[in-house]
Amino acid sequence: MRVLGIDPGLRNMGWGVIDVSGTRLAHVANGICHSDSGDLAHRLLSLHGQLTDVLARFQPDTAAVEHTFVNKDGVATLKLGQARGIALLVPAQAGLAVGEYAPNAVKKTVVGVGHAAKEQIQHMVRLHLPGVHLAGPDAADALAVAICHAHHVQSSGRLEAALARAAR
């Protein structure tokens, strides 16, 4: 299974692709979609195009997006929400199921602590994916989202299999 993780952002949208085979994880690629300053519509269009290119290039089977947090600046929160909309839309347009995870759930899954620092996330991503060269903190966060999604998909698959066996 190939998983695309996305860390939404208006200026820098991180993405990371991993392959999952049983309990084995393998890094495929990671990067950042950038949008320069300018009007919001063109920035969102740029992110849409870049993320569409990532999907076309790496052909993931499923995707996951991190929830955004609400900060004190309402305008910034709304803009971030619009970028998150692009992060949800592009994989959905490609016909993929899209998982969504709270930042604390991602950190808990990858680091073991729900309030981990960015450095801890990067360290654990490197441990889970040996040899990975991170394109930046946003790409590391996106890979962490992909790892979290892989873990949850595997867990739910095991649960469904156990329930099916129990129902026989």
Curated annotation (Swiss-Prot):
Manner of cofactor binding, per the entry note: Binds 2 Mg(2+) ion per subunit.
Enzyme class of the recorded protein, top EC level: hydrolase
Highest taxon, organism lineage: Bacteria
Gene Ontology cellular-component annotations: cytoplasm; Holliday junction resolvase complex
SS bonds (residue pairs): none
Role description: The RuvA-RuvB-RuvC complex processes Holliday junction (HJ) DNA during genetic recombination and DNA repair. Endonuclease that resolves HJ intermediates. Cleaves cruciform DNA by making single-stranded nicks across the HJ at symmetrical positions within the homologous arms, yielding a 5'-phosphate and a 3'-hydroxyl group; requires a central core of homology in the junction. The consensus cleavage sequence is 5'-(A/T)TT(C/G)-3'. Cleavage occurs on the 3'-side of the TT dinucleotide at the point of strand exchange.
Family the UniProt entry places it in: Belongs to the RuvC family.
Name of the protein this chain belongs to: Crossover junction endodeoxyribonuclease RuvC
Organism in which the protein naturally occurs: Cereibacter sphaeroides (strain ATCC 17023 / DSM 158 / JCM 6121 / CCUG 31486 / LMG 2827 / NBRC 12203 / NCIMB 8253 / ATH 2.4.1.) (Rhodobacter sphaeroides)
